[in-house]
């Protein structure tokens, strides 16, 4: 994600030596995920996610469109990612490589869209003619590693928070009701995939399988930006609370055996379970807050009448 950043030899040596002695610069253990802060905006589908110094914003929107000819009973779902120049000095002056956005967008798309997390059949209005087109716009605001994990959390939280306008169909006429007239309708979410990224280090500079004969390779969860710059391999796994492996992405680096992959999936599950529960709890609190505000507004209007 940040190939153009240079890190000094002394700092690189210090970080790797700390890892050899089971220490990380931010004080976390190797299997510890950063605390995730999820904030919902005033509008449905407006979500900000903060992991350490990494900040991601996601905005879910929808409009009526025409479905694909080969999928007349399904709606449309598109994910768009954009790295803002304010995300870090490495992205200033338009120095944003297409590979960064494509890699992140591809993994998020496999994790969310292709896994069927969103019920696209529920977006159909008139088969073969009209459907809802849902769009997730992800903006990276601050970069300190973990972009993929943070953006996946933001997209799923946004989809679960978003509500589309209610509609009435009379023949070929479609009436879209304003939110202040009719209660908007939530999207159909079939499961909640969450990404967890593992970074691998080879301090001995000897190429072999991860956890090979010397057993010297180091693996950590949720690397910071500086740790990402020094890693020798990376693995992103996506699971849901049902213990289903949604996708596995490994873009080169140190070779890996099946046992290590199984171990990573097992470690990721406890993190995914915690984040899923956190999203559900925050959604519940946000719904209660909105209902309370709506009740107060209704009572005030009744008094005025």
UniProtKB/Swiss-Prot annotation:
Molecular function in Gene Ontology: mRNA 3'-UTR AU-rich region binding
Localization in the cell: Cytoplasm; Nucleus, Nucleolus
UniProt entry tagged with the keyword GTP-binding: no
One cellular component (GO) term of this entry: nucleus
Cited Pfam families: RNase_PH, RNase_PH_C
Gene3D superfamilies: GHMP Kinase, N-terminal domain (3.30.230.70)
Keywords: Cytoplasm, Exosome, Nucleus, RNA-binding, rRNA processing
Biological process according to GO: exonucleolytic trimming to generate mature 3'-end of 5.8S rRNA from tricistronic rRNA transcript (SSU-rRNA, 5.8S rRNA, LSU-rRNA); nuclear mRNA surveillance; nuclear polyadenylation-dependent rRNA catabolic process; RNA catabolic process; RNA processing; rRNA catabolic process; TRAMP-dependent tRNA surveillance pathway; U1 snRNA 3'-end processing
Major location (coarse): cytoplasm
Family per similarity comment: Belongs to the RNase PH family.
Complex formation: Component of the RNA exosome complex. Specifically part of the catalytically inactive RNA exosome core complex (Exo-9) which may associate with the catalytic subunits RRP6 and DIS3 in cytoplasmic- and nuclear-specific RNA exosome complex forms. Exo-9 is formed by a hexameric base ring of RNase PH domain-containing subunits and a cap ring consisting of CSL4, RRP4 and RRP40. Interacts with LRP1.
Other facts noted in the record for this chain: Present with 4800 molecules/cell in log phase SD medium.
Biological role stated in the UniProt entry: Non-catalytic component of the RNA exosome complex which has 3'->5' exoribonuclease activity and participates in a multitude of cellular RNA processing and degradation events. In the nucleus, the RNA exosome complex is involved in proper maturation of stable RNA species such as rRNA, snRNA and snoRNA, in the elimination of RNA processing by-products and non-coding 'pervasive' transcripts, such as antisense RNA species and cryptic unstable transcripts (CUTs), and of mRNAs with processing defects, thereby limiting or excluding their export to the cytoplasm.
Protein name listed in UniProt: Exosome complex component RRP45
Organism, as annotated: Saccharomyces cerevisiae (strain ATCC 204508 / S288c) (Baker's yeast)
Gene name as annotated: RRP45
């Amino acid at each position: 994600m940040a190939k153009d950043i240079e890190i000094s030899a002394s700092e690189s040596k210090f970080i790797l030596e700390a890892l050899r002695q089971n220490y990380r610069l931010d004080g976390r253990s190797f299997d510890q995920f950063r605390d995730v802060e999820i904030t919902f905006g005033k509008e449905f589908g407006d979500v900000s996610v903060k992991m350490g110094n990494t900040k991601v914003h996601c905005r879910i929107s929808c409009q009526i469109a025409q479905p694909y000819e080969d999928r007349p009973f399904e709606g449309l779902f598109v994910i768009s990612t954009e790295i803002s120049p304010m995300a870090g000095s490495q992205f200033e002056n338009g120095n944003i490589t297409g590979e960064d956005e494509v890699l992140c967008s591809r993994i998020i798309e496999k994790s969310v869209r292709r896994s069927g997390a969103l019920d696209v059949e529920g977006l159909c209005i008139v088969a073969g003619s009209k459907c809802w087109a849902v769009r997730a716009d992800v903006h990276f605001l601050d970069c300190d590693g973990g972009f993929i994990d943070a953006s996946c959390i933001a997209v799923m939280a946004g989809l679960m928070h978003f509500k589309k306008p209610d509609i009435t169909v009379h023949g070929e006429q479609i009436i879209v009701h304003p939110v202040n007239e009719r209660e908007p309708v939530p999207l159909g979410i079939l499961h909640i995939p969450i990404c967890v990224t593992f970074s691998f280090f080879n301090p001995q500079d000897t190429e072999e399988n991860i956890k090979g004969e010397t057993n010297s390779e180091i693996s950590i969860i949720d690397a910071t930006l500086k740790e990402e710059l020094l890693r020798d391999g990376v693995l992103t796994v996506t699971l849901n609370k049902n213990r289903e492996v949604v996708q596995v992405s490994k873009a080169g680096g140190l070779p890996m055996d099946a046992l290590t992959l199984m171990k990573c999936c097992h470690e990721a599950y406890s993190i995914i379970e915690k984040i899923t529960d956190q999203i559900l709890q925050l959604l519940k609190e946000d719904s209660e807050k909105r209902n309370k505000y709506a009740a107060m507004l209704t009572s005030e209007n009744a008094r005025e009448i």
